[in-house]
Amino acid sequence: MGIFHKLTFKTIQRRSGIMNDSLQNTDLISHFSHPF
């Protein structure tokens, strides 16, 4: 589960980086930081 989340986060981070959405990227980091 942890490896899958890391890969998903990397993909999302890459897409967010291309779009240059700092606010969305920060929101995603906060969301993924919390345990489900």
UniProtKB/Swiss-Prot annotation:
It comes from Bacillus subtilis (strain 168). Required for translation of SpoIIID. This is Protein usd. The gene is usd.
